[in-house]
A protein has these predicted regions:
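Hydrophobic alpha-helical segments embedded in the membrane of multi-pass proteins
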Residues: 93-105, 119-126, 150-154, 232, ...
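Helix-loop-helix "hairpin" substructures at the membrane interface of multi-pass membrane proteins
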Residues: 220-296, 320-321, 325
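Short, non-helical or kinked segments that cap or interrupt transmembrane helices
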Residues: 106-127, 142, 161-174, 249, ...
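Transmembrane helix-bundle core of multi-pass membrane transporters
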Residues: 10, 15-23, 179-242, 345-352, ...
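Alpha-helical transmembrane segments within multi-pass membrane transporters and channels
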Residues: 136-179, 232-235, 334
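Cytosolic-side transmembrane-helix boundaries in multi-pass membrane proteins
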Residues: 1-17, 31-70, 219, 236-237, ...
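Single transmembrane alpha-helix segments in multi-pass membrane proteins
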Residues: 44, 85-134, 152-168, 314-317, ...
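Inter-helical junctions in multi-pass inner-membrane proteins, predominant
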Residues: 79-89, 241, 278-313, 338, ...
Length: 384
């Protein structure tokens, strides 16, 4: 490493603006980097000579964690980095990705490919800002966003279930439609009349007692309603999909629709319901951009997050918590890029902005085909 001996790295453990008695964590940068480099080299040699066998994925995860930690030590050498703030930012960046991925899980578990998550998010973001501004009520804005997502979900469902249109084409049409319509509304009305684009923003609120837990408390329990809702939906969807009759029926329709139909399950109704729920979830994810994060709508502000959410869904093996883990990974890369720009690290800012998208491509290249996608995913069903 090019870090001089005697230089220290300071990690601040509590997000900014929150009172805490936790001392900062000060570590010798050069010594730590040399030790971590030796540990990685040892792990590599062990893999070559004996191999980690079944524990290979665990070992790879551990080495990746060590590498990231070493990178943070190097980046913040002779400086300080707010780790608590980085983790809080990671969680916030992961919210729309997780909600979008859960939208994908709902649809694809029922056998409908939904690449229209991006368009649904964008429409949800715009309608949320517009309704919130017109009514002066953020909660009505969220409701408007959810309804907008549901309407696009209904269009996708009718095109792909009733008219048997190719699901990828249907999703692409919705993305283009949503992009054009939101850009038109934004340019024509929302940028011209600022009172139509000022919905306000949901403030974070601390959960008593839990928010006082050292380190984890301020990160997890001092947020706005979107983050708490994300955790609630994660639990509800996981239990619903894998521990209830409703979930069993939905999954059977995505695996073997013909067999499900034979057993008396209404394949069409189940798929319509799944895509509508998925649309509502994507609309809610879109509302996060305007009502939970920025407080206004800007053209194409979702910036491809709907597609990254799809990548998170695939990487998470079509399970809600798996997708959440992947969303945290993508969220971390985005939050880290922002922090490194502040630290003035000698890496071009354009490259830092590309990081989440590069990571998406790497993940998809390595993971597509390995996961267990639903057997009838993307296949239209016709009753005989």
């Amino acid at each position: 490493s090019n870090v001089e001996s005697g230089v220290t790295t300071t990690f601040v453990l509590t997000p900014g603006g929150i009172e805490s008695n936790l001392p900062d964590w000060i570590i010798p940068a050069s010594l730590t980097l040399n030790f971590l480099a030796f540990a990685c080299a040892f792990a590599g040699a062990y893999q070559l000579i004996r191999g980690f066998g079944e524990r290979q994925n665990l070992a790879l995860g551990g080495i990746a964690g060590v590498f990231i930690f070493a990178f943070l030590v190097w980046a913040a050498a002779d400086n300080s980095l707010n780790i608590g703030g980085l983790m809080n930012s990671t969680l916030n960046k992961a919210v729309p990705l997780t909600l979008g991925a859960m939208s994908g899980v709902l649809c694809e578990r029922a056998g409908i490919v939904n690449i229209a998550i991006e368009g649904m998010m964008l429409m949800g973001a715009m309608v949320g800002a517009l309704v919130g501004s017109l009514t002066g009520n953020i909660w009505l804005g969220i409701l408007g966003a959810v309804i907008a997502g549901a309407l696009l979900g209904l269009i996708h469902a009718v095109l792909s279930i009733k008219y048997l249109l190719d699901q990828i084409i249907s999703g692409t049409v919705i993305n283009i439609f949503a992009g054009g319509l939101t850009a038109f509304f934004s340019a024509k009305f929302m940028q011209t009349y600022q009172e139509l684009n000022n919905p306000g923003i949901l403030k974070p609120f601390a959960i008593p007692i839990l928010s006082k837990i050292p380190i984890a408390g301020p990160i997890l329990f001092n947020n706005n309603i979107f983050i708490y809702a994300m955790f609630f939906f994660l639990i509800v969807l996981t239990v619903g999909l894998f521990s209830t009759r409703w979930g069993l029926r939905l999954r059977s329709v995505g695996e073997h629709p013909k067999a499900a139909d034979t057993l008396g399950i209404n394949v069409f109704r189940t798929r319509y319901m799944a895509v509508l729920l998925g649309g509502m979830m994507a609309g809610f994810a879109g509302a996060y951009f305007t009502l939970g994060s920025v407080g206004r709508f800007d053209e194409f502000m979702t910036a491809g997050k709907g597609f990254i959410a799809l990548a998170a869904m695939i990487f998470g093996n079509w399970t809600p918590f798996g997708a959440f883990g992947a969303a945290l990974l993508f969220g971390f890369s985005e939050a880290l890029a922002a922090k490194l720009a502040i630290l003035g690290v000698k890496i071009p800012s354009e490259f830092l902005l590309m990081t989440p998208y590069i990571l998406t491509m790497i993940v998809l290249a390595g993971f597509v085909g390995r996961g267990q996608m639903p057997a009838a995913d993307g296949q239209p069903y016709e009753k005989e």
